[in-house]
Amino acid sequence: MQEYFEQCNREAKELAKILGFPVLVDEFETKEFEGCLIRHSSLIKPIIVANKVGKSTGRLNFTIAHEIGHGILKGHDRISEYVCNSSDICEDEFNTKINEKENEANRFAKNLLLPKKMFLKIIENLNFDYKNILKLKNKFNTSITLTAMRWVELSKDDIAIFYTIGENYKWWKGSETFFDKYNDKEPKSIIKVNNIYNAIENPSITIEDVYDSDEWFEEKTRYKFFIQSKCIYKNKVLSLIYIKEDL
């Protein structure tokens, strides 16, 4: 399937057409509705519908890939209609209330858009920073969040991402080696660092700085964190972290 996807310039909509799924992308009244896949006895193939209101190109691509998953994954044909809201189509993998079919479709979309072998080969000699995240986002037609998460998931370096709304911590994800250092530590519920404020005030640029680790986690300072923060939507900030040095 990756060969076909490359021929489609990594556009899930075009891949869906190759697979025989008609695709309707339109504006719907609610941002909560992301997409759906509809099966009916009158249809030769299921129809995919996607909502483009408030969606980046990368997010829309993920939504359509998710619906393709519902169309081809084993066991998904037992349900005639999948209506997926933003809580179902989850790039960040932190909604534990999602049912298994939605989780399977999310994993399918992630692996289709950012295949492990190809992505690993590209990132192995790159620095984990926004310059490269944005390049890869454009190359793979994905969102900033998904691209950063996949990098963290596959990396052997001490790296992590933090997602904040305003100054409030919402979730974080660390590489295996980073997580080993912090799996028993609680992130601070409110993160009062200039990076986040400056990123919100200056959404067009990436804010860089170095912080002691105790400004992010409830602990005595052990490491220096090199941080890049960027406002990805309104007051939502995604911060890239790697451990710069031991103290």
PLM feature segments, named:
Residues M1-L247:
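Active-site hotspot residues in diverse enzymes, especially metal/ion-binding acidic/histidine motifs
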